[in-house]
Amino acid sequence: MLESDRLISSQSIVSEDAMDRAIRPLSLSEYVGQDSVSSQMQIFINAARKRNDPLDHVLIFGPPGLGKTTLANIIAHEMGVNIRQTSGPVIERAGDIAAILTNLQQNDVLFIDEIHRLSPVIEEILYPAMEDYKLDIMIGEGPAARSIKLELPPFTLIGATTRAGLLTSPLRDRFGIVQRLEYYSVDSLTKIVARSAHLLGVPTKPEGAREIALRSRGTPRIANRLLRRVRDYSEVKGNGIITVDMAQQALEMLEVDQHGFDLMDRKLLLAVIEHFNGGPVGIDSIAAAIGEEKGTIEDVLEPFLIQQGFLMRTPRGRIATSKAYQHFGFSAIEQE
């Protein structure tokens, strides 16, 4: 099973890109949540515009689905400049990054998603471009190879990554502004769901929006996906208005519970509790018990359960916490 196969996946899905762009906020005033990031960026942007300078290079990191691409687009919009978007794996050759950089206009934004996946060769080209707005590339091969130096217009590089630890120190040190995006509160997600519902023309009661937010794992991308599925359900099974009852019925049908767990999350936790007395249990035993690959458990299922305090990863194996027992209605005696 892939992460992108799950309804509550925080990974981007190509078929949703167009709709996500339609509901994406364009200004910091519309950017709900991440209050510290918003207030800091507002000051940095206003200062850069006053000086008519490009904004310092920005690194945005955090879990997937929290709005790194959205924030990059907002920064460009607030600066009143164009944005060029690409991703680390796409830039394979020196000519690729050279073509992108030489087509930028003054103070434009270059947004590189998954920047931790840039090759060392591309990073080496970026260093002088970021520091001195100069491009130094080799043309040709062997004895005929020659170095060409080009002046670049001042620009802002915005890098986004879910794995900041994989960035090399020389690249990380060249970002003047570093922002971490955190998981969203239920209140912030409720506002996001209500705003998206309004833009999509979906009548939604405040309690209905909150019910969706509660099950969205702190992630706007998941909240917007669940909103679209609840909308479908309410149009077929109800009168098209998303109430709290309609949201609960739809999400129960979709097997997303009040903690945002899906069937596989619950299957894993129940296996640890019922088959292995709460653990500790090795990953191979869990994989055999639930019929899932070891890599999928480690990379897809476990992270959120651990982050929410339902599962512990120890040297002896996985252990279900008291929260996991309470979630399934097991008593303290049964837990022992």
UniProtKB/Swiss-Prot annotation:
BP terms from Gene Ontology: DNA recombination; DNA repair
NCBIfam families linked: PRK00080.1, ruvB
Matches recorded under InterPro entries: AAA+_ATPase, AAA_lid_4, DNA_helicase_Holl-junc_RuvB, P-loop_NTPase, RuvB-like_N, RuvB_C, WH-like_DNA-bd_sf, WH_DNA-bd_sf
Head domain (RuvB-H), as annotated region: 258-336
Residues that hold Mg(2+) according to the record: T69
UniProt comment concerning the protein's domains: Has 3 domains, the large (RuvB-L) and small ATPase (RuvB-S) domains and the C-terminal head (RuvB-H) domain. The head domain binds DNA, while the ATPase domains jointly bind ATP, ADP or are empty depending on the state of the subunit in the translocation cycle. During a single DNA translocation step the structure of each domain remains the same, but their relative positions change.
Organism: Legionella pneumophila (strain Corby)
Positions of the UniProt region annotated as Large ATPase domain (RuvB-L): 4-184
Gene of this entry: ruvB
Subcellular location: Cytoplasm
List of residues binding ATP: I23, R24, G65, K68, T69, T70, E131, D132, Y133, R174, Y184, R221
GO CC field: cytoplasm; Holliday junction resolvase complex
Primary enzyme class: hydrolase
CDD domains in alphabetical order: AAA
Residues that, per the record, bind DNA: R313, R318
Annotated function: The RuvA-RuvB-RuvC complex processes Holliday junction (HJ) DNA during genetic recombination and DNA repair, while the RuvA-RuvB complex plays an important role in the rescue of blocked DNA replication forks via replication fork reversal (RFR). RuvA specifically binds to HJ cruciform DNA, conferring on it an open structure. The RuvB hexamer acts as an ATP-dependent pump, pulling dsDNA into and through the RuvAB complex. RuvB forms 2 homohexamers on either side of HJ DNA bound by 1 or 2 RuvA tetramers; 4 subunits per hexamer contact DNA at a time.
Presence of the UniProt keyword Protein biosynthesis in the record: no
SUPFAM superfamilies according to UniProt: P-loop containing nucleoside triphosphate hydrolases, Winged helix' DNA-binding domain
Coiled coil feature spans: none
Principal localisation: cytoplasm
Pfam families registered for this protein in UniProt: AAA_lid_4, RuvB_C, RuvB_N
Protein family per UniProt: Belongs to the RuvB family.
Alphabetized GO MF terms: ATP binding; ATP hydrolysis activity; four-way junction DNA binding; four-way junction helicase activity
EC numbers, comma separated: 3.6.4.-
The protein, known as: Holliday junction branch migration complex subunit RuvB
Entry keyword set: ATP-binding, Cytoplasm, DNA damage, DNA recombination, DNA repair, DNA-binding, Hydrolase, Nucleotide-binding
Record-linked PANTHER family: HOLLIDAY JUNCTION BRANCH MIGRATION COMPLEX SUBUNIT RUVB, PTHR42848
Region (Small ATPAse domain (RuvB-S)): 185-255
